[in-house]
Amino acid sequence: MQLTDKELEIVEILEKDSRTSNEDLAAMTSLTVSETEEVLKKLEDQKIIVRYTSIVDWSKISGHEGVTAMIDVKVTPKRGVGFDEIAKRIYRFKEVKSVYLMSGAYDLSVIIEGQSMNEVARFVSQKLSTLDSVISTTTHFILKKYKHDGTIFEPDEEDKRIVVSP
């Protein structure tokens, strides 16, 4: 679908900060609030804007450390449905946060979250690897997040450059 310049501008603003109010969106795009609301409804109805989310640094909250793993999955695609059927079976598991079709050495990239490495290991061995089309898996545990969806998790460091003025 082709978006107008204003629609695209709204999408880009909301992608950076989904908490931007309709009034602020209107001011930033030179639209009225009612025009902005119409654009948002259209974008939501057409599933261009799918969901409004927050990025949380869970490592700073005691008791919510958890484990995130990226799993490379090789599968045998089925005639007529390709990778879609197995991807659908995988993304229905509650542990699964994301599934991507990939190019390269493996077919699917699956991101899951669990409370412990053992919980992730049980998911891989008891649920994921037992699916008919799955040939092999390789699990990578995320040790630390530095940047996620464009957001840097490390605190801003002071600028140590010397100020030069005329």
Q: Locations of the language-model features?
A:
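A compositional/biophysical signature of low hydrophobicity enriched in polar/charged and small residues
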Residues: 1-166
